[in-house]
């Protein structure tokens, strides 16, 4: 496929063929950048970055984003530059590079506000909220997420509200407000269902499963985790969590040997991805690890 054909495919929203040859996709981004077509390089990168993220290929994704962002004239391209800055900020976040993630999201926020790009502004606020979550500043997480949701509603852009709603739920959850977090995650699940965002549904089923566990609803947690597992294969990070999810269920039922076995399998899977855990997930690993360690003592 030529770079132009890659871009046409991305515009149609059919990313499955592109997902099969991510190296060629990255080459297409670089080809546009080399000839000075920054607009096409940024658009292709912005439309396809999730193909690398879903496979846990952080270095490859970051490299493709960097190629687009450093193309001659990239600083003048509205919309797609903000989207690509946000994407690279997320790659940096997952890699544990807080500084680069903050810089990318801050730059995206400034650029989006300058160009009156509501979606870009919401994305950037979400990225900054994600960093605050890792910093343990849960009040700031909720504040930034609510700002983004209000901006999305003012613009009439439901799609732009989806990510900050997820971050608001995470902030509330890490404050220990599990009933309120459940309501927000349910709202997020309903919104993504309405928008047809199938890729985001397993994430919220996963989160709801953990909230139900903390509320003592083991059967409900099992249902959520089982529903998440029906989407196995779509996201390397989420799939690696499956064993840890079931370890938590086993521990809640007092099945300690099974819990330890599944926990070891899950942690091996996560470590093989070389990804910095999302803060809400890290808190659950710490919680479950402490429970399992207490049994051994």
Predicted features and spans:
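Short, well-ordered secondary-structure microsegments
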Residues: 2-75, 80-85
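Solenoidal tandem-repeat scaffolds enriched in leucines and small polar residues
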Residues: 150-164, 170-176, 180, 190-192
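Amphipathic alpha-helical segments of tetratricopeptide repeats
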Residues: 29-30, 69-70, 106-117, 146-157, ...
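C-terminal non-catalytic interaction modules
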Residues: 256-297
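Tandem amphipathic alpha-helical repeat scaffolds
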Residues: 8-10, 42-55, 82-96, 120-137, ...
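Alpha-helix C-terminal capping/termination sites
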Residues: 14, 18-21, 33-34, 54, ...
């Amino acid at each position: 496929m030529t770079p132009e054909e890659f871009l046409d495919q991305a515009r149609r929203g059919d990313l499955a063929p592109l997902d099969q040859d991510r190296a060629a996709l990255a080459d297409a981004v670089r080809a546009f950048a080399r000839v000075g077509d920054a607009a096409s390089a940024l658009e292709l990168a912005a439309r396809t970055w999730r193909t690398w993220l879903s496979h846990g290929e952080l270095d490859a994704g970051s490299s493709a984003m960097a190629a687009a962002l450093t193309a001659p004239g990239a600083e003048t391209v509205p919309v797609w530059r903000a989207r690509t800055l946000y994407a690279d900020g997320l790659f940096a976040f997952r890699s544990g590079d807080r500084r680069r993630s903050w810089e990318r999201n801050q730059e995206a926020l400034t650029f989006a506000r300058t160009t009156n790009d509501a979606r870009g502004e919401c994305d950037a606020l979400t990225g900054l909220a994600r960093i605050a979550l890792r910093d343990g500043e849960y009040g700031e997480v909720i504040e930034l997420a609510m700002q983004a949701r209000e901006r999305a509603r003012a613009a009439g852009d439901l799609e732009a509200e989806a990510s900050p709603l997820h971050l608001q739920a995470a902030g509330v959850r890490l404050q220990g407000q599990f009933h309120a977090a459940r309501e927000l995650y349910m709202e997020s699940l309903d919104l993504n269902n309405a928008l047809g965002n199938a890729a985001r549904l397993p994430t919220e089923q996963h989160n709801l499963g953990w909230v139900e566990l903390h509320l003592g609803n083991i059967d409900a947690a099992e249902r959520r985790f089982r529903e998440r597992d029906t989407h196995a294969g779509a996201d390397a990070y989420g799939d690696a969590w499956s064993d840890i999810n079931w370890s938590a269920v086993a521990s809640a039922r007092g099945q300690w040997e099974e819990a330890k076995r599944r926990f070891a399998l899950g942690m091996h899977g996560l470590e093989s991805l070389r990804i910095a855990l999302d803060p809400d997930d890290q808190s659950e690993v710490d919680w479950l690890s402490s429970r399992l360690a207490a049994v051994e003592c």
